[in-house]
Amino acid sequence: MKRSAILILDPRGNISLGGKDVINRHLEYAKNLYSKSDRHKLVVCSTSYQEKRTFYSKFMDRYILSKPTFNPLIFSWRAYRRLRKEKVEVSLIVVSDPWESFWTGFFLVKLIGRKVPIQMQIHGDIADPLWRKINWKNRIRFYLAKYSCSKATSIRAVGQSQKNNLIKNLSLSKSKITIIPVPMNIKALNLKNLRIAQRPKSIALIGRIHQDRGIWNFLDLINKLNDVSRDFDVIIIGSGKAESEFLSRVKLVIPRQRLQILGQMSEESLAKMWNKTGVLVSLAPVESYGRVMREALISGVPVWALKSSGALDLISEFNSKTVRLIDLNGSAKALMKEFESLIRVKPDYKLRNKLVAENKSLVSMLVNSWLNLVKN
């Protein structure tokens, strides 16, 4: 029996770049898809600087077509030729952004020569007015997204505030947008009971080290805290374009014996760091969901966040004392007082249980959204 494909297009190679964790997440999607409909198979057309192979399995095929590219015309042509060679019949195209990935899907539909629905996945809060003000590239991308979002069959968002921004600022209909957060790897997290006495006096920044992720806000924060007390450690996990300059400036503030710089980590390695983390800070001016914030809360680590869609959704949905907004304009003493208060706050097990329960259904929700588009 011929199986049709749910096709994921990844011209910039984000799936390959994400490594084993991201690939395994897509494999979970594929297994869930097979359990619901053995007539469909997940196929990923991706790129990579390192891999040049094709990966086949019972549940998912992954084709590495080239090095990462920003050219949707070239990548759509390569994808089309490969799909014809593999005799793949595409029933749905899933794109990962409103730009290169969407236009790859748009041109691929033209090459296929028949109507194929396109689901656009938007993880960032691109419709937040603050996002387009970060730099001139974002302003251009905002207006490009306004057009491409109107052309997509369906849009998968990751949070309620993000959806509200898409509706309000991109003039999209409610019915076009489905909220399905990115699943967490709960198996890797420590779900044992946590005592406050075990929480270390440390502050952590986790994620991409890019200009738009609030890294200079973090530097200002640890500067202020350091002016009041030297009795805390700093943990930095992640990598990115601004890594060299940022870390050099952090080292001028925090001595080596109080500083852990751990680079990019796998989900399993990151999970082991939560028991060494006192408070997680999230200082990106625009945050749509905050998967790391949720992983921290499940692990019993309180979150100190700048006001964003992701933080506001957490606060409004769960009303927990373990999630607080940070006032970066506050005095050094006021910030230290808030930091020490968070170190002592009790873990919120009710919140943890809700997040774990919510996470269980996310893979199935995403796959169902694909099958519904195929049926329609």
Where does each model-flagged region fall?
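Aromatic "clamp/platform" in nucleotide-sugar-dependent glycosyltransferases that forms part
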Residues: 285
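A conserved mid-protein helix/loop that constitutes part of the nucleotide-sugar donor-binding site
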Residues: 20-27, 201, 205-224, 241-244
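Membrane-proximal helix-turn-helix segments that form the acceptor-binding/catalytic region
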Residues: 25-34, 81-84, 103, 111, ...
